[in-house]
A protein has these predicted regions:
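Helix-turn-helix DNA-binding elements, focusing on the entry/boundary residues of the two helices
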Residues: 23, 34, 45, 60-63
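Recognition helix of helix-turn-helix/homeodomain-like DNA-binding domains
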Residues: 41-57, 77-81
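DNA major-groove recognition helix of helix-turn-helix/homeodomain DNA-binding modules
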Residues: 42, 61-76
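Charge-dense, extended regions
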Residues: 183-245
Length: 245
């Protein structure tokens, strides 16, 4: 399944942050002059020229515009230091829809968030809407070139590596089920890198409000992968209706 990115620059490069040189490459891939690109980006040609030469930094606002104008992947959106925050179900649904998740396609809008930041926000949530939880494994499948170093580091800082490991394992199983062997191998390698930091402490997959009775039931009825990652969840790859690519 396509990620919904048709521009030829998408076939040339997947970038995790926007630099002046990458803006220049994107502009040339679009066969645009500096003047044409500047007009579309809402800046002066002189300013764009300085950015492309590295004399001015790419601001977050310009990076966001570039993602829309050049149609580069959302993984190009700038990342900052992670801060825990409370997001409601509507936020996650809208952002997933904007990133192309089929289950929330009807919410597709123009505002996007870097998928790695969205995934971290979700993994750090105490409670998520079940439909959002089911969508998490889609993010590593649709955006395999996300910034794994940033994600892993922040997951460990927040003690969320078990949640991350389980979600990536679900994505790996989905890739295997879909016959995408190369992606399956890449995701398996990501899971393996998380193994040494696996926590013994029991956790939920973003369902902290579940009752003690539910917790007791899940200890006996969870998939092996959930047990391995010490998570109380019955989510399995068979339940993921919209993750196949």
């Amino acid at each position: 399944m396509s990620l919904g990115l048709s521009h030829k620059y998408n076939k040339l490069c997947y970038i995790q942050c926007v630099t002046g040189d990458e803006l220049k490459n994107a502009r040339k891939a679009s066969s645009w002059t500096q003047a044409q690109a500047a007009a579309r980006l809402g800046v002066t040609q002189a300013y764009l020229s300085m950015v492309e030469r590295g004399e001015r930094a790419v601001s977050s606002e310009l990076a966001s515009k570039a993602v829309r104008v050049f149609e580069v992947p959302a993984t190009a959106l700038p990342l900052s230091r992670y801060q825990a925050r409370v997001r409601d179900a509507g936020f996650f649904q809208a952002m997933l829809g904007s990133l192309g998740y089929p289950g929330f396609a009807y919410l597709r809008g123009s505002v996007r968030l870097n998928p790695v930041e969205l995934l971290m926000d979700a993994l750090d949530a105490d409670d998520l809407d079940s439909r959002v939880t089911e969508a998490l494994a889609w993010l590593p499948l649709a955006y395999p070139h996300l910034n794994w170093d940033w994600l892993t580091a922040n997951a460990k800082l927040r003690d969320r590596q078990n949640r991350l490991g389980f979600v990536v394992e679900l994505a790996r199983q989905a890739a295997e089920k879909d016959g995408r062997s190369q992606l399956e191998e890449e995701l398996a390698a990501r899971v393996a890198k998380l193994e040494p930091s696996r926590l013994v402490k029991e956790d939920t997959l973003c369902r902290e409000s579940m009752t003690q009775a539910e917790r007791a039931w899940l200890r006996d009825h969870r998939p092996k992968s959930a047990e391995h990652w010490n998570l109380l969840t019955d989510l399995s790859v068979e339940q993921l209706d919209h993750v196949a690519l």
